[in-house]
Amino acid sequence: VLGCLGALLVMLPRRISRPLTGGAIGAGIAGLFQELIRPILANSVVTKPLHDLLYTWSGLKLQGAVIMFLVTAGIVLAWDMNRPRVAAAFGRLDPGTQRRIRWGYITLAVLLAVLFPMYAGNFIGQVLLTVGLFVLMGMGLNLEVGIAGLLDLGFVAFYAVGAYVTGLLMADSPFALAHLSYWQAMPIAVLCSVIVGVLFGVPVLKVRGDYLAVATLGLGEIVRVIVLSDAAAPLLAGAKGILQIPRPAIGGFELATPVALFYLTLVASVVAAYFAWRLEDSRLGRAWMAIRDDEDVAQALGINLINVKLLAYGLGAAFAGLAGSIFAVMLGSIYPHSFQLIISINILALIIVGGMGSLPGVVLGAAVLIGLPEMLREFGEFRYLFYGLAIIAVMRLKPEGLWPSAARRREIALDAETVAAQAASVSEQKA
């Protein structure tokens, strides 16, 4: 049946098929994401009647699905009819006005992102918090892989270092080294992650390509084995983990809810994104790009490969250490099984899907690969199937990623031109 409907949509004119497709997507979103939509509608006196119209206690009503289909189809139809006029009117505006309008939309989006969790409830706050942690780690790995070209499959080790140092410095348990506040423990955790990142990079300085992936994978596993070992158990608690880690507090107000911790993660992500953006445009960022493209040429140009690589590992680890620090206070406890290899793979996957070297791509990749599976927990067993399909689809349809950087777009375009020129040359030779 679905195949017949799909074939029918393809045969219909675009002006008809697009509203129908949009309506179906709108109705599907209303049903699949009801855990997100229902609390927002039900918690307000103004929107409560709309909630009762669309939903019942067991889910989306039939009339709700029809209403969502018609409303979404109408919006798509209206947009298709008016888009040329809107684009023409926008094009007639002077560049200054266009820039102000764009910044107005960006400001509105930021305000919605800030205010949305307050009304969405703790479940959505927890999902956004998880996405935020992966955004932080994604920005760190993006420095290593996307900009410097250093494939790191042991990245989760830095995440673990940040979490464990925070736990050891804050926990109210026999394993605590001190009883610091979060604001005292967090910078120390980040610094320790940087140190471990630099030490991590020393053995793999001369390793390239696939061998680098295997080497970093092994080093990451070494950290996990050390945490689980009997020798480190008196300090790190082994498999029992570190318990009773208190929540951070600001002026006597404890950040105890997922929404409050999300705002902490949001602030950390904004600061980290600014730092990463400035790094990318700096002399160090250009040196990273040079060694990514060709290490031998970069060295011939006078770039110190050792210093530049170690800085990439150390600064990338700082982002993971910050995420690990927040993760420790989010759970209130730390266990070794929380830091598995699959986390490194997830971070690498979201960078590939979002776009190598792109900060907005990291956010989009985390939203798609981390946020959507969290929202659709009834399909949780298919999470890794979804990851695989998403990566294959991106590689086939948008090899540069969903939101690539300008440099990556240029590289893809140049590669395509080179391949086309080579194909034309071969055709001429055969002729």
Predicted regions, residues:
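Transmembrane alpha-helices and adjacent helix-loop boundaries
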Residues: 1-431
